[in-house]
Amino acid sequence: GYRLFQHAYAMEEAHLIEALKHIPAREIPSPKNHAEAMRSQYQEFWNDAVASEIANLKAYGVYKLERLPPGARPINCRYVFKVKANQQGLVDRLKARLVVQGFRQRYGIDYLKTHASVCKLSTFRVQMAFCAQHDLLHDIIDVKSAYLEADMKLPVYINIPGKTPPKGMGFRLIKSLYGTKQAGHNWHQTIVPKLINEWGFQ
């Protein structure tokens, strides 16, 4: 799985190093959708970005092909395309992220809880004051692809642009893909027990 992602990313990088990395990032428009990306003069590079994203999702086991149950309504997804620039303002890479159109989800069928606790500003200020008073370091961690570590609790099926499943089949979400209403809640439910039980937080 992860090797497939690494291979796709290496292919993308090879194309970019050769052809795009001397171009200012602002000169390459970000497509609004998959169809526009495939019509773009940079179509092959956006195609590589899509392949890299799909390989990453497969590496995380985000979805799998299943027979659609009666009454199931797959939710549309879209790609969000972005040109990433380096410190010189030149093209670093072309990125595609698959996002669920969560506004199409139905409460009680596709999702239940959506809340996720976050740190209050007052709590953060107390932490900063405590660290300053005791000459401590304060670290902030960003978990890469965090939502993709969290399991989906309800069966949700999606449509992926450019991928047509066999008749009667659909792509079921196994992990909390970006855009789903419950993604933040699922990640919170995943990380808190680990922080307390495995890493010693109270």
Q: Which residue ranges define each predicted feature?
A:
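Chromodomain-type histone methyl-lysine reader module
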Residues: 1-193, 197-202
